[in-house]
Amino acid sequence: MGRAKRIPYGVSDFIDIIERNQYYVDKTMYIPKLEDEPDALFFIRPRRFGKSLFISMLRAYYDIKRKDKFDKLFGNLWIGSHPTENQGKYQVLFLDFSKIGGSIDQLEENFNAYCNECIDSFIETYQEYYPERVVESVLKAKTAARKLNAIGIAAEKKNLPLYLIVDEYDNFTNVVLNEQGEEVYTALTHASGFYREIFKVFKGMFSKIFMTGVSPVTLDDLTSGFNIGWHISTKPAFNQMLGFSTEDVRELFTYYKENGEIRPDSDVEAIINEMKPWYDNYCFSKSALKTQSKVFNSDMVFYYLRNYRETGEGPENMMDPNTKTDYGKMKKLLQLDKLDGDRKGVLRTIIENGEIIGNIEESFPAKLLVRPQIFISLLFYYGMLTIKGTRGEQLVLGIPNNNVRKQYYTYLLEQYDEVCAVDEMSLKSLFTDMAFDGQWKPALEFMAQAYAKVSSVRDSIEGERNLQGFFMAYLNLNSYYYTMPELELNHGYCDFFLLPDLTHYDTKHSYIIELKMLSKKDFGAMADNGRQTKAEEQWEQAVEQINRYADAPRVEALRQGTKLHKIIMQFEGYQLRKIDEID
């Protein structure tokens, strides 16, 4: 048995993966599907879904300079037995706009310098196809547009097919939009802006174009000058083109098990089931809902595999630390620090309900980002929402997994922290006592006190849904439980079930937590029955509810042998008035 393939975590160079014997999940069967589409294509996916690797594969497949390496690079892949007529046919210009940075004053200069370097490299690579005077004129030209025009005229005369591949086409424009504002952004993408002008040149000279990005915003603002693009991001044929299907993940772990790289007693199905709530559940096409399995985030799967191979178990922290960097970028792109009330309301609805009803706009200009419906679409393209179902003609868009849910809670925690900082380290220590010693009261009272501090500063937070949102955010700081809000038990929905994570910790206790709130006016008022206060009546009803939840048949399996605690917390406004465990 030969050496097992390397795990390509973070690798985006297709040739490097093949030549250095790294594991590759075959996506080459999508090549003929792409060729059936129009010649200029835009494809949007969230970060860490393998966009750069996919277009690296396309480069290797279509590049005329690599035509003779087809068998070496693709012989063991699907396309190796099903090559298309276009294999090795094109001169390929590749541009990665994430490499363009600098201050706004230097942006045009840096953009031109980067493009010049790429175009010079292009003409040097393919100089045998051009007259010497053309090569010289390209190298001497001062601007990218002039260089491209010189190549375009010469290529057309000699009938040379050109392929343009652009990675992260919207990277620096998104940064400009969010750091410099709409006016500066518009200057780049409208009228005679340099970015728009270069796209006009692209339009006239390339036989095929493939562009990727994370948002369709720039696409919309460029399209009147570049109106030949075809947006395939939500087409069912390409729903699984990036990311991994469940079968891909099964084959991946089975391969490493059979090659002795992970424990021989590894339960592949159990591994998949552990990863699913964290990395799976993406659906990018309404038409794929009932016909295709959901999609895993591929980078996260490799993160898990790498940890599993090293330690014999999944990572203690199921969130890849690199996700924190992604959150920072996403926070800027979504302008989370500048949200108005309507868009904050969208986030609140998503955080509290786990989903929202809406539709996905295929493209939209930057000036419409302030609209709540457009904001929903933006969250979808960034991978913060996914298609869960339909409601009439509208879509049910939900949080795809725990990895993304944690990012929402991070946003919520930041909002609370701006009002009144909470000592998270102390709270995490109390969670440890809660998990191993069953000492639940200090942790829950700590959160109740924090809620009161935040609410006293900002009265608008008061309300039962906001109480639940607050507790949900802080309960998710614990590492010992999966916090399950609104879990259905015996035809009702408990506020929180703390499901022990026994895969990573020997947790001894589990919890059902029910939160109840009455206004200050109602708390001491008499109930309609005339026998007790509304607070007393509410408490009685809560006891009946929580006992019914605990008697649900599935609770026995959920608590996994741990001791189950039934806790009710009752608030008068934002002040905790009663907390108790129900026997």
Language model features with spans:
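Walker A/P-loop-proximal flanking segment of P-loop NTPase domains
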Residues: 1-66, 71-79
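P-loop NTPase motor core
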Residues: 10, 26, 60-124
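A short beta-strand-to-loop transition that corresponds to the Sensor-1 phosphate-sensing loop
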Residues: 98, 167-168, 202-227, 568-574
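Substrate-engagement module of ASCE P-loop NTPases
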Residues: 150-158, 184-209
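Conserved P-loop NTPase "ATPase switch" module shared by AAA+ and STAND
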Residues: 158-188
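Amphipathic alpha-helical segments of the small helical/lid subdomains adjacent to P-loop NTPase cores
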Residues: 218-225, 232-306
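Extended alpha-helical interface modules used as scaffolds for assembling large macromolecular complexes
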Residues: 229, 294-544, 548-550, 578-583
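Domain-level recognition of nuclease-like catalytic cores that cleave nucleotide substrates
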Residues: 554-583
